Structures are given as structure tokens and as C-alpha cells.
Amino acid sequence: MGDFILPNLRDKPLSVLHVGRGFVVVDKLPHFLSVPGRGHDMDDCVVARVKEVFPLAKGPISVHRLDVETSGLMVLALRRDAHRTLSMQFEKREVDKLYIALLEGRVEADGGRIELAFSLDWPNRPKRVYDPQNGKLGITEWEVIERTEKATRVRFKPITGRTHQLRVHAAHEKGIGHPIIGDSLYGNPDLAERLMLHSTQLSFNHPETSQRLHFDMPAPF
């Protein structure tokens, strides 16, 4: 694709993989915010680092986000028109995303489709809880790639993009019933130093030419 490679940003929380007309694709490391959090000590994030490299970027920049614990591919807009176009693609579910995860234990099923509604657990936020009455429906397709007695590697294809969707769908008994390894909210955080969830593939239409673009970043685990 002729990717334009830039040096890693300071402290290496993310790498710029591709610069296109009006957008940039990055690889985010775990334990790093996608957008600013609340408080001055949470200003450092993907958006802030991209603005450092592209000081002439205009508009909101953020098109979508990954959980702070999740690593992998993100696309950000560098112009307002690109932001509108890319945001619309996410809204219309025209963006294809694939994730790799390691789940606790041995998953016997080979794959499936999960349709599970959940909502914010206010007393324990940011945790989400199963809520078939008032929750928002999340839809995820998944398949097993490899399994052992202690862990199962799966590929997730989220159809919707709810916060914590893959984590809830993995952990809940009405989903897969096996939390993602290292999940501090829905599983045993002592099993790994990070959440074993990675955005490995991202496909969308170029905001100017409508050419379909595909990006891959293998999971580091």
C-alpha cells in the first residue's frame, strides 16, 4: 500500500503506521488512553500524541476509540471533512474490525454469534452489566483459532461497537463464559500484566477516493 512510516512517538505509547490524505492509522499500546480522561493528569493520550506530530490537524481528530487496556489499530482524522466521512462509516457499520484475544480456560465451542444487551453498572463504573430490559444490544461474531487447557485464542468480529462489548461478551455466561485473560473488571487480573485483547485488522473506505483500505497488525501475544 506504500505506507509512509514515521518514527515512534516519545515513550513509544503508539506508532504511526500510515499517513493518508486527511487521516492517520496508528498502533496503540495497552495502558494508554485513546482520548483525554478527566483531570489534567489524564491529558496524555493517542489524540494528544497525534496532534504533536500533526500540529496542523483540524477538527475533533478522534473517530473511534479503544479501551485503555486494549492495544492495536486505530484511525484518526486530520481534517474536518475526513472526520465527517470516517465517522459516518463507523455509524453505518461500514468499517470492518477484527480483534484477537486470549480467553481464560478451554473454550469447547468453535465459534458463534453473540447478541447480548448490557448497560453501565453505575455503582461500579466503568463496569458493564447484563441488562436485557434497558441495555443496548451488542452483537459479536467469534471463532476459535487455537485452544489449550489453560487458554483459548479467539478472533472477534464486533458488529456493533459498544463500550466493553468484547469483554462482556467473552466473560458473561450468556456469551462465551470465559473472560479475556488479564481483565481487571470481568476476570482475573492476576493472570497477565495486560488485557489480552488486540485490534488486529481495520478496513475502511478512503475518505477522499472511497478506495477500500486494509490494515493489519499482528497481536503481540
Regions found by a protein language model. Name each.
Residues 1-221:
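RNA pseudouridine synthases
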